[in-house]
Amino acid sequence: MAGQQFQYDDSGNTFFYFLTSFVGLIVIPATYYLWPRDQNAEQIRLKNIRKVYGRCMWYRLRLLKPQPNIIPTVKKIVLLAGWALFLFLAYKVSKTDREYQEYNPYEVLNLDPGATVAEIKKQYRLLSLKYHPDKGGDEVMFMRIAKAYAALTDEESRKNWEEFGNPDGPQATSFGIALPAWIVDQKNSILVLLVYGLAFMVILPVVVGSWWYRSIRYSGDQILIRTTQIYTYFVYKTRNMDMKRLIMVLAGASEFDPQYNKDSTSRPTDNILIPQLIREIGSINLKKNEPPLTCPYSLKARVLLLSHLARMKIPETLEEDQQFMLKKCPALLQEMVNVICQLIIMARSREEREFRAPTLASLENCMKLSQMAVQGLQQFKSPLLQLPHIEEDNLRRVSNHKKYKIKTIQDLVSLKESDRHSLLHFLEDEKYEEVMAVLGSFPYVTMDIKSQVLDDEDSNNITVGSLVTVLVKLTRQTMAEVFEKEQSICAAEEQPTEDGQSDANKIKAKGGWQQKNKGPKKMPKSKKKKPLKKKPTTVPLPQAKQQKQKQANGVVGSEAAIKEEEDDISDKGSDSEEEETNRDSQSEKEDGSDRESDREQDEKQSKDDEAEWQELQQSIQRKERALLETKSKITHPVYSLYFPEEKQEWWWLYIADRKEQTLISMPYHVCTLKDTEEVELKFPAPGKPGNYQYTVFLRSDSYMGLDQIKPLKLEVHEAKPVPENHPQWDTAIEGDEDQEDSEGFEDSFEEEEEEEEGGD
């Protein structure tokens, strides 16, 4: 537009507003995310768990790790400098004068709004005498006073002030840019262009490009996409993977390849040390040629993993590489579990026979290998080796004991304290207390299972093809809590038995002679007799008396006989009346019982409706909580003697058919189980009615021998037939018929009107 000019900030006042906002947008989020956490809290936490986790490798590495004292200090200095700059700019903004102020003639004349004309004239006289230029006053102030007086007394000036905010009428409004004028100065144009070019043409493309290059190489779980492709190929190729094959495929991940991961290193000494470890292990097949499983980096990772599972001592130059490899194993095994599940889903969706799904054994071997990698144990080793001070030498004393045959952690926990102490007599008191402390920290998880069909009238009735929802409630306790409860129960059971034995001894001591004289009596079995119904019986008179009465006065006898007959008739009538009344009372009772049964049914139905409504509300609340809450994945640290990183307790939960060796529901990775957790497992019901027996598995990804198994029985019924007639449909049809009738009536009425008009 012609004549348009941009006004930049010459004074720098408006630029301070922009600069303050910009600095605040940087400093506030940076303080939240970059302010160093309290190191003392971490030290206190490590001190509190030292009794249990003091022998773990990750605990010792955490203590040996040098504390980063310089980096937190630098962060604090930078953030504090940013806050100082922000506060300085805010103070500067608060002290700057406003360039645009609304014109108010009352303020110029030092009057309150709404002053009268007389007050205005009086104040004008006083101020004009004071600021008149002829009397040595301020000329500018005098002009402002005259302008304000005219705005309040002159009709036209007052109207302009009320409408436009100025007694002189509408004025030109100017808008400025909150940037200093030196930025657009011709002298500084080259410098400004260089800064803009560096920021938007070099720095920004480099940042976006590096982020994009990284994002296309990694998946959402920070696993290389090339690794996922390798796992998918070999899992599909080998349908049933044993443990050796699984370790071989795991070691082929691109995370261990220096070409794709800079954190992975390859040293010249590996050509000497790795063959030595291969000879010591002695169970590695080097004849197959399956790249990348036979590449040098994959072979190195496999050897380091096998040496870790065998708890072998390796050279110090390889320890760092082994720790790096072990830290990657849990995430890689979780990715392999996901790949197996995806292939199973693809096999179910496709009806091609050539597409073969991985077996359930392959999936369970992946989960088993995760436990082995965390605990540093081979496949068939005893779970008791997870405990401290229990090694191969003294394990035989525990597992091959004559009285107690202890094979699992649960067997050791189920013993009494005295038996446990005698079994572990080869340990010193301090070591025994440490073993008990570690054993008490192990998790004990219970499962409560409930199967139902959501969004159905009869949620407990499972029909063919319905979507079954299995609600599993997990409750985590420690082994210490479990054997504390068992000890209290045992003590409560022993007390009454001891009291009973002492009472029996007292009785024997006092009255032993009574027991000698009196033998044990056998009580006859009492049989319950059925109550007999009493019939009305008439007592007959003796014959001699009857004959005497008849001979003495026959008339009286005849009258008496007549009276007796009348009494018999009256008795029969009374009996019939009693029977009728009994029938009436029975019918009334039956009616009352029917009413009571109806009431009971109504009450039962109302209770069922309330229970269903409560379950529905609970499910809705559960879903809302799952959507809104973001639970932390920090649950409980795992006791692992040879794992180099602190790991949290996580679990896999799934349903399988052990008989058919098929996976029913996909594994759910439970990462937030602290105390209790509710998990929903969904799967389609079988296609045929009948009784089905499944198994719910809860497998740990860190501990060996602590898996939980619970049976799940399903009774599948035929699907309900689709109703052909429904009252709602009848009303809809009637409404359509009424509408058609009304339309037909309107058409006939219109035709009659047209005929009448034509006749006219």
UniProtKB/Swiss-Prot annotation:
- What tissues is it present in? Expressed in kidney (at protein level).
Instruction: Report the residue ranges that make up the SEC63 domain in this protein.
Output: 367-457, 637-714
Q: What is this protein called?
A: Translocation protein SEC63 homolog
Q: Where are the transmembrane segments?
A: 15-35, 70-90, 189-209
Q: Give start and end of each J domain.
A: 104-165
Encoded by which gene? Sec63
Primary role = Mediates cotranslational and post-translational transport of certain precursor polypeptides across endoplasmic reticulum (ER). Proposed to play an auxiliary role in recognition of precursors with short and apolar signal peptides. May cooperate with SEC62 and HSPA5/BiP to facilitate targeting of small presecretory proteins into the SEC61 channel-forming translocon complex, triggering channel opening for polypeptide translocation to the ER lumen. Required for efficient PKD1/Polycystin-1 biogenesis and trafficking to the plasma membrane of the primary cilia.
**Comp. bias intervals (Basic residues):** 518-536
What organism is listed for this UniProt entry?
Mus musculus
Pfam families cross-referenced by the UniProt entry: DnaJ, Sec63
Span list, region Disordered: 492-617, 720-760
Query: Subunit structure, briefly?
Result: The ER translocon complex consists of channel-forming core components SEC61A1, SEC61B and SEC61G and different auxiliary components such as SEC62 and SEC63.
Q: How does it sit in the membrane?
A: Multi-pass membrane protein
Query: Where does the record say this protein resides?
Result: Endoplasmic reticulum membrane
Q: Does the record's keyword annotation contain S-adenosyl-L-methionine?
A: no
Cystine links in this protein are none
> List-wise, which residues carry Phosphothreonine?
537
Q: Name one GO biological process term.
A: SRP-dependent cotranslational protein targeting to membrane
Regions of biased composition (Basic and acidic residues) lie at 582-608
Report which superkingdom the organism of origin falls in.
Answer: Eukaryota
Task: Give start-end positions of Low complexity composition bias.
Answer: 543-552
Q: What is the lineage of its organism?
A: Eukaryota, Metazoa, Chordata, Craniata, Vertebrata
- What is one term from the GO cellular component aspect held by the record? membrane
